[in-house]
């Protein structure tokens, strides 16, 4: 009976083990990428209406928080969007638009993620946009 019980435990232990496809360990770092929007005089502008879209034109709900980094800073993308990217590292376009109702600032950005989908990476895109 004892041998049967131990055999049963060994079988359960072997079945419950799983193999991990990738060795992924994400850090607690939370990445977000900002853009500064300025007027024609180069003065940062707050309180703009922001629209962010993916490559298919679908609008992304990117939370815009007040940043301690100064006026006119807007979040383009953050780590909460890693799942929308391919783990293959292929960059995808993100379109950013800010308006005060009469003037518009537009920017195109390229982002990707790591193979574990832990963090986003900004591949290209402006740091500053001007309202025109």
Residue ranges and their predicted role:
Residues 15, 22-24, 84-86, 114-116:
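Extracellular secreted precursors and ectodomains with disulfide-bonded cysteine-rich loops/domains
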Residues 1-18:
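Sec-dependent bacterial lipoprotein signal peptides
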Residues 48-97:
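Tryptophan-paired
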Residues 41-47:
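A short beta-turn/strand-edge loop motif at beta-sheet boundaries
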Residues 42, 57-60, 103:
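Residue-level signal for glycine
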Residues 17-32, 38-41, 120-132:
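Beta-strand-rich domain onsets/edges
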Residues 98-125:
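Structured interaction patches on ligand/partner-binding surfaces of diverse proteins
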Residues 37-38, 53:
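Hydrophobic alpha-helical segments, especially N-terminal targeting/anchoring helices
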